[in-house]
Amino acid sequence: SAEVAGAVIEGAKLTFNVLQ
């Protein structure tokens, strides 16, 4: 669903920020 996709995207952004 759109909600799940949004959560996945937000999680990816957070992970990307942590890895930088």
UniProtKB/Swiss-Prot annotation:
It is found in: Secreted; Nematocyst; Target cell membrane. Stable up to about 65 degrees Celsius. Its main location: secreted. Keywords: Cytolysis, Ion transport, Lipid-binding, Membrane, Nematocyst, Secreted, Target cell membrane, Target membrane, Toxin, Transmembrane, Transport. The record marks 16 as: Part of the hydrophobic cavity (in subunit A) that receives Val-60 from the adjacent subunit (B). One of its GO terms (molecular function) is toxin activity. Disulfide bonds: none annotated. GO terms for cellular component: extracellular region; membrane; nematocyst; other organism cell membrane. The keyword Membrane applies. One of its GO terms (biological process) is monoatomic ion transport. Pore-forming toxin (PFT) that consists of a crown-shaped octamer or nonamer that forms cation-selective hydrophilic pores of about 1.5 nm (inside) and 13 nm (outside) and causes cytolysis. It causes cardiac stimulation. Also causes hemolysis (HC(50)=0.4 nM). Interestingly, the Phe-16 is crucial for hemolysis. Octamer or nonamer in membranes. Monomer in the soluble state. This protein has been found to bind carbohydrates, since it shows a substantial delay in elution profile in size-exclusion chromatography. The carbohydrate pocket ovelaps with the lipid-binding module of actinoporins. Composed of a long N-terminal alpha-helix and a core region rich in beta-sheet structures. Before the pore formation, the alpha-helix binds the lipid membrane, partitions into the lipid-water interface and stabilizes the monomeric molecule on the membrane. Finally, it traverses the bilayer, thus forming the transmembrane pore. Belongs to the actinoporin family. Sea anemone subfamily. This is DELTA-actitoxin-Afr1b.
